[in-house]
A protein has these predicted regions:
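Short, ordered loop/turn segments at secondary-structure junctions
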Residues: 47, 51, 466, 485-487, ...
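Conserved alpha/beta-domain cores
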Residues: 99-100, 552, 562-900
Length: 900
């Protein structure tokens, strides 16, 4: 452990790291090293490895400091030499930034500290060195504010309170009679530093550290601590980032965007992160530091002239006003803009992906502080991948791999109805930070959003600006609206990464946290009122607006065609209605992997006949009721087979226990008694007789069919007679009849005999034959263990992984919520096994059944029909074990196709 290299230096075109060292140096550290190596101007610095973060939690803070001390001091000396200044020196001071950097991008989730190394003596030296006392004290007050928050824990006491430092700033500005931070003079900034330190001492009981090395170690440890803060943990859960990855810490020489009118800071993207358009775009602020842009504290200006004009149009600002008061960087700093544009092109070509970059201009010199593959919306993800393919920057397989299956879901989100929009009341407009349509009730705080969401309410978070502490609320909100911040603010970047609708920088809104109201151009809305956001054009509307299905782009279709070219795993859908079948077919499904017949029985007329069949006390009574059901079932099947013309439709025979279909309330029992001409008491007794202690392991599935063969006969006749009618109409139906819940070969044999006998009788009556297959669901562990025997009769297997998971783990799907959070928290389980297939247990049963089944029937078709069929990692496992297809709900078909 002691001999392990933990610190990697970079600067002046040299670096000890490379882009492929993300695991060791995190994304930020690896890319800073790489930028040095390809000639991009980057301030010198060093990166502490992710392994050190893990050691920090294993062996403790002081032990890690002792391990790091020698390497950090050596690396710091290298930075001092390159910058020709000295850390902590009162005449020629070097200031540092300390930033986090995990191997996967986690924007805003961990902590950053700027201007580190200042104290009352060093700040005077900085003022003399730069000849700019205002800049020096502005840097000092920013450092005390940031360090006090991140390292010393200065937070608002109550959620309604504003940041304690901002409260001090507001008070000083009020006393001075000014509105903007940059209107404060040197004496005001000195006063802020003093008041900040007093507030820290009062709230934390600790004095602000004056020793620069003590500050540095405090900052490094604070970044390691931030790996385990609540928002970082939540973000990792959302993104599937393992805790054991850890974060790196990057320490860099400070360059300053707040040294006057020739200095600036900004964030830019090589392509539009919201739409995917091939347009360089970004935001900048003159005389500011990077956190001002990202945190949304000030609404910045646009980098490009085109972007600036588009922004002004959205804000209702005239071209004359824009030129004078809101010029683009392209206009205000043309030479710096040219350099920036050249380097962003170079970086995108080098990484062959859309880049998200941070930069600072210090007195006319451009420095890059970061580049990373940019977070993007689902729509942008698809467009960027297909554009890069067309531009020859990536190949077809790379284009497929660049698209995250779960983000395709965003493309399928509804949009506002054009008809409904025509009569909607527009309140204001902001920046279209993340596209989509969102309707919900206004909430102002993250914890309220989470609580309301848990109660089943749709919410829209309204904030002055968001911070990483708001992540839990943003995660459950339908959309986010902010008064401040631009297209690169925290709200915008995180919302795009989550696929959430977001409107930012809506300057006309006035948010009052204390009274929980928001005023928008004279209209007052309170917490709980409905609001609608259009993240595509930045419009904000009062009330709820009706939505409709989104239209899919040509790039989406092209991506799906690529997927079909490179996969051998077919994707079917789980569908019980013609509409669902049509939707799935539009998304590329090549059949139905699960058609549940029980859902067809719950219409008003059908349920009466179904209940008559269940409650009948003899075979004749059941046959009479089933005769009523037959035409209904037949028509239902005709609609589904018609929608899936030419593709296989796998129909599962009746599966649920019968008690699910009978009335359990007095009124329903009275109506049933009247319809059947029997007493209420008779109905009550029959209903009670159907109740079971453990119905999911009771009288259901093939056990029903074997107890009441007439049910199987009716359903077989309905399926095949529907197909005969369609064949006569010129359609090409492909029926598959599936016996559910088989555990013993003889259960299946008995049902197969009934099915084939009924089919033979029907074909003789009609003078027409239909080719069909009979298979079974493998959802009982015993069926997997004896799959070779079952395959001697079954023509295909469909794995019902929902029930197979339930019976393998012994977990009830309906009751797991009572202990699952504890199991996930304690890492007893890594994921919910009903969401992600358990490959080591349930998955091995699937593999065993496939291998055993094909050992006796080499053409055995195998598929999966649980909702695992639409979960990307589960789909990949299905491909690995040799399944022929996966089946999932219609709107997850594109996700499964991409994952396959």
């Amino acid at each position: 452990m002691e001999n392990q290299k933990r610190v990697y230096s970079f600067g002046a075109g040299k670096a000890e790291g490379r882009a492929d060292m993300r695991n060791e140096l995190g994304g930020k550290g690896a890319n800073l090293a790489e930028m040095n190596l390809i000639g991009v101007p980057v301030p010198p610095g060093f990166t502490i490895t992710t392994d050190t973060c893990n050691d920090y939690y294993k062996i403790g803070k002081q032990e890690v400091i002792d391990l790091l001390r020698g390497e950090v001091e050596k690396a710091l000396k290298s930075v001092e030499d390159l910058m020709a200044s000295k850390f902590g020196d009162v005449e020629n001071p070097l200031l540092l930034s300390v930033r986090s950097g995990a191997r996967a991008s986690m924007p805003g989730m961990m902590d950053t500290i700027l201007n580190l190394g200042l104290n009352d003596e060093v700040v005077e030296g900085l003022a003399r060195k730069t000849g700019n006392p205002r800049f020096a004290y502005d840097a000092y007050r920013r450092f005390v504010q940031m360090y006090g928050d991140v390292v010393m824990g200065m937070k608002p006491v109550n959620k309604e309170d504003i940041d304690p430092f901002e409260a001090v700033i507001d008070k000083v500005k009020e006393e001075k009679g000014v509105k903007l931070d940059n209107e404060l003079d040197v004496e005001d900034l000195k006063k802020l530093v003093r008041l900040f330190k007093e507030a820290i001492q009062q709230q934390t009981g600790k004095a602000f550290p004056t020793n620069p090395m003590e500050q540095l170690w405090g900052a490094i440890c604070a970044v390691f601590d931030s790996w385990m803060n609540e928002r970082a943990i939540l973000y990792r859960k959302m993104e599937g980032i393992p805790a054991e990855w850890g974060t790196a810490v990057t320490v860099m020489a400070m360059v300053f965007g707040n040294m006057g009118e020739t200095s600036a800071t900004g964030v830019c993207f090589s392509r539009d992160a919201a739409t995917g358009e091939d347009l360089f775009n970004g935001e900048w602020l003159v005389n500011a530091q990077g956190e001002d842009v990202v945190a949304g504290i000030r609404t910045p200006q646009q980098i490009t002239l085109e972007g600036s004009r588009r922004w002004a149009e959205l804000q209702g600002i005239s071209e004359e006003d824009r030129k004078v008061n809101y010029p683009s960087m392209e206009e205000a700093m043309p030479e710096i803009y040219r350099q920036l544009d050249t380097i962003q092109t170079k970086l995108e070509e080098h990484y062959r992906d859309m880049q998200d970059m941070e930069f600072t201009v210090q007195e006319g010199k451009l420095w890059f502080l970061q580049t990373r593959n940019g977070k993007r919306t689902g729509a942008a993800m698809v467009k960027i991948a297909m554009d890069l393919l067309r531009q020859g920057m990536i190949d077809e397989k790379t284009a497929i791999n660049r698209c995250e299956p779960n983000k395709l879901d965003e493309l399928l989100h509804p949009v506002f109805s054009k008809e409904a929009l025509s009569s909607a009341k527009e309140l204001t407009r902001g920046l279209p930070a993340s596209p989509g349509a969102a309707c919900g009730q206004i909430v102002f705080f993250a914890e309220d959003a989470a609580k309301w969401h848990a109660d089943g309410r749709k919410v829209v978070m309204v904030r002055i600006e968001t911070s990483p502490e708001d992540l839990a609320g943003m995660a459950v909100a339908e959309g986010i609206l902010t008064a401040r911040g631009g297209m690169t603010s925290h709200a915008a970047v995180v919302a795009r990464g989550m696929g959430k609708c977001c409107v930012s920088g809506a300057g006309a809104i006035n948010v009052d946290y204390k009274n929980r109201i928001v005023e928008i151009d004279g209209v007052v809305l309170k917490e709980g009122d409905y609001i609608s956001l259009n993240g595509t054009n930045g419009c904000v509307y009062k009330g709820e607006i009706r939505t409709e299905a989104a239209e899919l782009s040509g790039d989406f279709a092209a991506l799906m065609d690529l997927c079909a070219k490179y996969t051998h795993l077919q994707v079917r859908t789980n569908a019980d209605t013609p509409h669902d079948a049509e939707v799935a077919r539009k998304f590329g499904a090549v059949g139905i992997g699960l058609c549940r017949t029980e859902h067809m029985f719950f219409d008003k007329e059908k349920i009466v006949a179904m209940r008559e069949m269940i409650l009948a006390d003899d075979v004749e009574g059941r046959r009479k009721a089933l005769a009523k059901l037959l035409p209904y079932q037949k028509e239902d099947f005709k609609g589904i087979f018609r929608a899936m013309d030419g593709y296989p439709v796998n129909v599962r025979l009746l599966d649920p226990p019968l008690h699910e279909f009978v009335p359990h309330d007095i009124k329903g029992q009275e109506e049933m008694a009247q319809a059947m001409g029997v007493t209420v008491e008779y109905i009550r007794q029959r209903v009670e007789s159907l109740c079971e202690h453990n119905p999911m392991l009771g009288h259901r599935g093939c056990r029903l069919g074997n107890t009441y063969p007439c049910i199987t006969q009716m359903q077989t006749r309905a399926i095949l007679s529907a197909c005969i009618d369609l064949k006569r109409e010129g359609f090409d139906p492909h029926p598959e009849i599936m016996v559910p819940l088989t555990g013993i070969l003889y259960e299946f044999e008995a049902q197969e005999e009934v099915i084939r006998a009924e089919a033979a009788e029907l074909f003789k009556e009609e003078g027409v034959e239909i080719f069909f297959k009979v298979g079974t669901m493998i959802e009982i562990p015993r069926a997997a263990l004896t799959a070779d025997r079952i395959a001697t009769h079954a023509e295909y297997f469909s794995f019902g992984t929902n029930d197979l998971t339930q019976m393998t783990f012994g977990y009830s799907r309906d009751d797991i919520a009572s202990f699952l959070p504890v199991y996930l928290e304690k890492k007893i389980l890594k994921v919910d096994p009903f969401q992600v297939l358990d490959q080591n247990g349930v998955g091995q049963l699937v593999k065993m059944a496939v291998d055993k089944g094909r050992s006796v029937r080499n053409d055995l078709k195998c598929g999966i029909c649980g909702e695992h069929g639409g979960e990307p990692s589960s789909v990949k496992f299905c491909h690995h074990v040799g399944l022929n297809y996966v089946s999932c709900s219609p709107f997850r078909v594109p996700i499964a196709r991409l994952a396959a």
